[in-house]
Amino acid sequence: MKKILFISLMLIAGITTTFAQAQIKFDRTEYDFGTFSEDAPVQKCVFTFTNVGDKPLVINQAAASCGCTIPTYTKTPIKPGEKGTVEVTYNGKTKFSGHFKKAITIRTNGVPEITRIYVEGTMTEAKSDK
């Protein structure tokens, strides 16, 4: 009998914990810089997200797939219903011209725990004055 009561209580506690949590929802998960020249290799964009859960949301980490892509993000906890941002800077200096697509992995204390956002674009060669 004690085992059944213990298991029942653990199940109820687990279900309650599952429903009370932070939840991240991005306005968009991809951004296209379009075509730009290697004369202006630094491109920036902002991703906005909302905490649609019922607990404060914390971004624990934002990591890019390449050193040429730098994410910065809201460091303070985001209350339920509030918004935060992830700013992404792509620096194509010393990179080959052409199309690129970079992933940024966002880790949070909420659901989903891991979200990937993407930036892409096409960098063209600088025009030479001949």
Predicted segments, located by residue:
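Short, acidic/polar linear motifs in exposed loop/turn regions
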Residues: 52-55, 94, 110
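Buried hydrophobic-core signal for structured, non-transmembrane domains
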Residues: 17, 45-51, 88, 102-107
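Hydrophobic core residues within well-ordered beta-strands of beta-rich domains
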Residues: 43-45, 58, 84, 100, ...
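Terminal connector regions
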Residues: 96-125
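Surface-exposed binding patches on compact interaction domains or structured appendages
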Residues: 54-85
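Short, hydrophobic beta-strand segments
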Residues: 86-94
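Beta-sheet-dominated interaction scaffolds and their linkers
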Residues: 20-48, 52, 123-130
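Bacterial Sec-dependent N-terminal signal peptides
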Residues: 1-23
